[in-house]
Amino acid sequence: MNKKKILKFICSAVLSFTLFSGYKSYAWDGKVDGTGTHALIVTQAVEILKNDVISTSPLSVKENFKILESNLKKLQRGSTYPDYDPKAYALYQDHFWDPDTDNNFTKDSKWYLAYGINETGESQLRKLFALAKDEWKKGNYEQATWLLGQGLHYFGDFHTPYHPSNVTAVDSAGHTKFETYVEGKKDSYKLHTAGANSVKEFYPTTLQNTNLDNWITEYSRGWAKKAKNMYYAHATMSHSWKDWEIAATETMHNVQIGSAGIIYRFLNEVSGTINTTENSKINEIMVVIKTANEDKAGTDHYIHFGIEAKDGKKYEWTLDNPGNDFEKNQEDSYRINLKDNKLTLQDIAKTWIRKERGAGVRDDWKPEYVKVIINSDVKYQANINEWFGDNKTFYINNK
């Protein structure tokens, strides 16, 4: 939606500073061709799993691991893509996550005076895990692996000490310098196993919490806190090269082992070895909408997502991110916070998206698909590929 929001001067100044000074706002280095630190992390995570635990895993997990391994290049490319997504936020706001505040730097940094972004590295991981799981179960293994790689990118981001501390390249030159330091030595940090006792002491812990949504958050929080603590202990610009080497070694080892844990949980989820549970009360809804890749498919009109409960009560939210959403060939994601609501999964009778009647010139819209994620699971989805005129409502109650 081209709402032509004017960001405040400070944001423009910061963006100019970031771009023209050569600083990067993203975390571990990664190349568009699926190489660099991010790709090394996921590659080693797969090797760690193969060396540690796959041989003793259930047959279904072994088979799914073989599929994943055969799509390793997709995993690698996915792991670097978020830094090159042309439609991403200019300052990579959603790559940050402070595990103590649950915010990215747009909520925690005093210098950032523009529009707050409610997506974080942690929420992106949950979203992409759900999307990858959904595609895998459909047999779309390449797409699923690519999406999982993207999720692992965000998981990797909050292992670099600066990201979980919400310290950007604007806050400290150390942000980029530390990442460059690690990139130059990345091969020296390679791991090939999570440890001699990992089969008994680590991997089982990744399956104990059957509530997937809660597990992703708390598993991520544990690792992110380690990285944040490492920032203050060894990784600021005031620390020595010896300190930086301590921080680099610790965080790079952690992210490889942690990523192996994410992949192991994913393989068990899609293999059906976990009796997954979920919260009845809905705390958050994520809505993912792709606008068709056709001429004039985008719209400037408002789009809404709605729910009707079985008691007849209706809820509706405007889907509106900072910047331009619902543009041609663009996928947009929205987080709807329901923590103060008493709505449960069992209450839902209908879900929909609705295009509002706009003032003035007619501006039709053609969505390609919509997916609704609750509890790290795609609950409702639909392939649409229809033109929406004024005030059109589309119901999306199919799984």
Curated annotation (Swiss-Prot):
Zn(2+) 1 binds at W28, H38, D157. Residues 1-28 form the signal peptide. Binds 3 Ca(2+) ions. Binds 3 Zn(2+) ions. Ca(2+) 2 binds at D320, N321, G323, D325. Residues 29-277 form the Zn-dependent PLC domain. Residues 275-282 are annotated as: Linker. Transmembrane segments: none annotated. One of its GO terms (cellular component) is extracellular region. It is an enzyme of class 3 (hydrolase). Ca(2+) 1 binds at G298, D363. The protein is composed of 2 domains; the N-terminal domain contains the phospholipase C active site (PLC), in a cleft which is also occupied by the 3 zinc ions. The C-terminal domain is a putative phospholipid-recognition domain, which shows structural homology with phospholipid-binding C2-like domains from a range of eukaryotic proteins. The ability to bind membrane phospholipids in a Ca(2+) dependent manner and toxicity is conferred by this C-terminal domain, which also contributes to the sphingomyelinase activity. This is Phospholipase C.
